[in-house]
């Protein structure tokens, strides 16, 4: 095993703590709080998926379809989290009329992107006796592109 799993393993207890504290504490019951709750739950799911990517690397030579599904699910998590965070920023920053347009736009981008991620190819690179491992291919590049566009939308909101 590489050291790539150390950070997610260390982050899981903190993520659990944040989820438990948020759920147990009383807070304002508004839409922004509900989105935040989804963000912290998605974060925990993302940590689990990141650990599963290491498992995917271990089983890739015997079960490439299962491993690819794990990797692509992680990419979809990245798009989903970034899309939801983008919507959260718009929800707290933009007037009501613009919110409807941005909600539809970000929603469509996220949904279509998830479909494309599963369609596009992905490759796994494992080197140096499992010390270096990463994914590459059109699916990964597409995910980077979509997340960059969503972050660009967030930056545009600031101005």
Task: Indicate where each model-derived feature is located.
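Hydrophobic alpha-helical transmembrane segments of multi-pass membrane proteins
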Residues: 5-27, 31-64, 70-88, 105-123
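Membrane-interfacial entry segments at the cytosolic side of transmembrane helices
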Residues: 98-105
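Membrane-interfacial segments
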Residues: 26, 90-97
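Extracellular-loop-to-transmembrane junctions of the mid-late helices
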Residues: 1-11, 113-158
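Alpha-helical transmembrane segments in multipass membrane proteins, preferentially the mid-helix core
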Residues: 16-22, 84-90, 144-159
């Amino acid at each position: 095993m590489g050291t790539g799993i150390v950070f997610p393993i260390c982050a899981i207890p903190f993520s659990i703590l944040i989820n438990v504290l948020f759920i147990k504490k009383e807070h304002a019951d508004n839409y922004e709080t509900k989105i935040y709750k989804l963000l912290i739950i998605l974060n925990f799911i993302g940590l689990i998926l990141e650990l599963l990517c290491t498992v995917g690397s271990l089983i890739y030579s015997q079960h490439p379809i299962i491993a690819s599904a794990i990797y692509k699910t992680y990419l979809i998590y990245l798009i989903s989290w970034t899309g939801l965070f983008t919507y959260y920023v718009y929800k707290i920053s933009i007037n009501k009329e613009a919110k409807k347009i941005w909600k539809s736009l970000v929603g469509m981008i996220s949904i279509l992107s998830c479909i494309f991620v599963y369609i596009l190819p992905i490759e796994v690179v494992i080197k140096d006796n499992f010390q270096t491992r990463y994914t590459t291919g059109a699916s990964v590049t597409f995910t980077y592109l979509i997340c960059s566009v969503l972050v660009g939308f967030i930056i545009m909101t600031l101005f």
